[in-house]
Amino acid sequence: MEVSSRIKELREEMQKHDYHYYILDAPLISDSGYDRLMQELKKLEEEYPQYITADSPTQRVAGKASEKFSPVRHRFPLLSLDNAFSYQDLLEFDRRIGRVARTLSYMAELKIDGVSIALVYENGVLLNAATRGDGLVGEDVTANIRTIKTIPLRLRHSLPRLEVRGEVFMPKQEFIRLNEEKEEKGERVFANPRNAAAGSLRQLDPRVTAGRALSAFVYDIIYMEGQTLAEQQEAWHFMQELGLPVNPEVRFCADINAVLAFTEEYAEKRHELPYEIDGVVVKLNTLAEREELGATARSPRWAMAYKFPAEEKETRLLGVEINVGRTGIIAPTALLEPVFLAGTTVSRASMHNFDLIKEKDLRIGDMVLLHKAGDIIPEIIASLPEKRSGEERVITPPENCPACDSKVARFAGEVAYRCENINCPARLKESLIFFASRGAMDIDGLGSAVIEQLVNKDMVKRIDDLYRLREEEITALERMGPKSAANLIKAINESKSRPLSRLLTALGIRHIGARSAKILSRHIHDIDDFYKLGVENLTSIPEIGPKMAESMVNFFAEPRNRETIEDLKDLGVNTREEAIEAGEQLLQGKTFVLTGTLPSLTRQQASEMIESRGGKVSSSVSKKTSYVVAGDDPGSKLDKALQLELTILDEAGFLNLLGLS
């Protein structure tokens, strides 16, 4: 292949990877794979400088602003850093800048694997925040940055203007928690903490960002009015004084040998840190000499990023173990030929879902490339098809649940396969906890500790077994005397008379919450009728969408679920909802807001009284609110209602409106 063609091919491939990495937050190759492409391109351009162009990945920072956010033009370009892949590269860097710099002392910092940001403060107050983007134009993420608690909205000391650069990252434990949550919901997981941080920071709704424990470190002053500094070490202390989050894991290094020692130390300690790092950043300490050295179009000449060697190992995929999660999700786990990786011996790895298995073309018997996502979770990066013998076997999703043999289902728009059997042994405890919860069958005294004992002692193997329990059996449980047992049996019996909407909620049908269960039970008054209805019938009901309808059809098509419902009926559990006559829809078209504590009604009871009469309960006050029902300690909702001159009712007035006084 001609040199010019190979250079063009490398640029196009890297631009594709830049798009997937920076814009979609879904990398197609590992960082080390990308670095190899960059090294090859750099080498070719050095040998054939006539082919260097202004838009080559070696000449600019990768990435561009997403169209979802307002673009922000950086007052000072946010450049990238040149990479060093060996200690020899660092020594060469030291020699190169030694030709200009008179004092070769450095600041060594950890290279956080996150998202670069620029923060601007005016008169000590956070004005705006932007991502790096292409180095010249980034994305305005101010609203989301404000949700990160480590970033101060006001500095300890006021300066006319301060612009700093930093990195937003996701701690390892939050990365694990978030991916577990996404797996339980049947959603695609994040590949690594960097992508999780990017995906969380670039949410259109700041509340989503706030729900994810992002953190940040600030490491450079880009511009400052009202203060002059001489060294990076001094800048670090000054940023700390201002209350900005600086990483304590930094070191002033008198020479390049001290830098090498710092790098060696953290190559060993990196797995002990609560966040992911992929190298060490080395910066000339003297700021005036940085000015003399200057920068290329892509990177400063006075700094370099040493990248740790990729911790990846090859091993063989021996088989796949299929497990059922607590919410019924079918989860594949890779069984591997044991291999030592990043401090531990690895013999198993999460495969997340069958879509990823297909995308990566993983087969039983394959040689695969393994790494640890977030330095913690073993994960297969890719298969190595060039090493196949032809005897490898394709991995396919199971048709039946491995725990209970029920048919598995998959919903539109989800990557997960699920077991729909509510009595599946793998998900029984969670099903029971939800069934007994306040918003469902509301069985007082039946908490997780009691359920744990009931299931572990085989006293409850299915949901309907709850209604077969005897007082003397419960008395034998730990911390359950005769009085507690009698109260629990009473609560179980009382739950039999709950309305159909509560039972539909309690069954834990995917996408069917308390509100949609109430809507369904207003239109369909007998649980038996759900057996006959298809998606088209259900979507004709107002507010019931295709996902809800599909979920209902799948649930009632499962024979084991039908059996449970029939047994619940036989045991005296109500499965009907009385049809409400048109005349009884007293509150049709009326919107209520509840605030404060009512003397005798819980908020849930008041809500049910409103909804059963055709009214709607809202969580916020507006001009469209018909009534505000206020109890003790009502808070700001009452203030707003008074401001808007809305009708305000106490409990007595509310009951009178309903004809229950």
UniProtKB/Swiss-Prot annotation:
Task: Specify the superkingdom.
Answer: Bacteria
- Residues that bind NAD(+), according to the entry? D31, S32, G33, Y34, D35, S80, L81, E109, R132, E167, K283, K307
Cofactor(s) needed for function: Mg(2+); Mn(2+)
Q: Which UniProt keywords apply?
A: DNA damage, DNA repair, DNA replication, Ligase, Magnesium, Manganese, Metal-binding, NAD, Zinc
Q: Which residues does the annotation say bind Zn(2+)?
A: C401, C404, C419, C424
Q: Which family does it belong to?
A: Belongs to the NAD-dependent DNA ligase family. LigA subfamily.
- Put simply, this protein is called DNA ligase
Which organism was this protein described from?
Syntrophomonas wolfei subsp. wolfei (strain DSM 2245B / Goettingen)
Q: Which gene encodes it?
A: ligA
